[in-house]
Amino acid sequence: MTVAMLAVAFKISGSSIGMWSIMLPGNAGTPFWGIPRSLRSDEFSVGTLFQLSQSHNGYAPISEILRGDLTDVRMVYGASCWSIITLFRPVLWGYLLFGFEFGLAFAWSAKLCLMVLVSFDCAFLIIKSKPLSLLFSCLLCFSPLIQWWGTGEVILYGQALVLLLDRALFTRKRNIRIIAMVAIAWLCGCYIMLMYPAWMVPFFFIFALMGVFRIIEYCQTLKSNDQHSVLAWSLSDTFVLVFCLLISAGLIFLSFFQSSEAMTSVMNTVYPGARFETGGSGLPELFSYAIPLFYAFDSPLVSNECEIATILCFFPLGTLASLLCFIKRRDWQLIVLTALQLFFLVFAFIGFPSFLSRITLMYNVPVLRLLFPIGYLELLLFLISVEKAKESQGKYSSIGYLPIILIIGLILSSAFQIFMLLSAKYLVARMLYLLMLMLFCLFSCLSFCS
């Protein structure tokens, strides 16, 4: 948190607002550190300018600056304003408390620092290894996908919910449990107010499973001889949690009611209002997790780095390794997470019938947006499998060959991405190369799961 405080104090952010010093004539000044990206026009010329306009509007919920007419900025535009909805958007609090410049630094720096900490703690609950949890946190939070999109609230709030649920369950103090339940209700509102179902829906499945894992472990603890180490769940705890959730739901309903006209207009649009996805278009970008690491320096092969930015997840190594580890160890948590991964992959590569897409809410998810949740889950599965293999084989085993395997995998992944971009019309050749990559991953899994 010291890093975040220093970044705010020195007004350091990841915004590309420095592009305006290039575009506006006679305007001097260059960024102190980093390169402004013209590709991030939706950030520096839309989102950030919304926040800047609000600083000249007294942070009122109705803007007289945007569009040159009265505009409700609470719900659709997601701008900072003195409104109930801002209670569920903590990233915007810096603008209201410190002004635009410090608020911009707060929105970038505090979010990233918290994301690193929360990702580490959440991964440790599942992986049970501090070094691997730290690796997970770094690979996730500093991935091309997070850095290019400048987002990540969905994993920040979702993982924080899992941690707070764990804290509420595995505690011996009633006041700690009450505080955790209040925070859970608030974070549920934060998650809903992200207003981006393309990521909210698949990540909901992931974090819901993690929450179920914690509940099952808590029940097992109560039944064991170690039951006195935790506080038993009581009926009063249920009432407190339901009461907090009802308050949060009431505030959310009030926020929607205040912006009902704007929401109705959005829902009546072709996009995103009439979106209905059934999947099946394929997701070859999953195999190109290596080369996006270098798009920050040069990207001559693509026109939009953001759309194919991924997480360094070693796909499909995690899925294959988890299946092999399950065969050997019968770890039910591992197989449940793998089943969810296969659920996403079936939607991406095969597709769902319309009724199944509607029932599962996956109709809100374009296939390309599955890069984020699939990459997240793949990285988690991979590191869980590594930890399971290390436990079964000992510290000095064939797991030592893993760095070499990963380096070769990264080279193959980069070659596949370049080959795919340069030879789009050679479908058969691409499929053969893809098969070679998958066979390599299978061989890699066998080398440390056998």
Where do the protein language model's features map onto the residues?
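Active-site lumenal/periplasmic loops and adjacent helix-entry segments of GT-C-fold
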Residues: 16-156, 299
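Membrane-interface helix-loop-helix junctions at transmembrane boundaries of multi-pass membrane enzymes
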Residues: 321-351
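Membrane-embedded helix bundles of polyisoprenyl
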Residues: 113-125, 129-219, 233-257, 407-414
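Membrane-helix boundary/interfacial segments in multi-pass membrane proteins
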Residues: 102, 106, 144-152, 342-399, ...
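Transmembrane alpha-helical segments
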Residues: 115-123, 158-169, 208-213, 319-322, ...
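Aromatic-rich transmembrane-lumenal/periplasmic boundary elements in polytopic membrane proteins
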Residues: 2-73, 233-291
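Periplasmic/ER-lumenal interhelical loops and adjacent helix-loop junctions
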Residues: 250-333, 368
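Membrane-interface junctions at the ends of membrane-embedded or membrane-associated helices
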Residues: 168-180, 214-229, 356, 382-405, ...
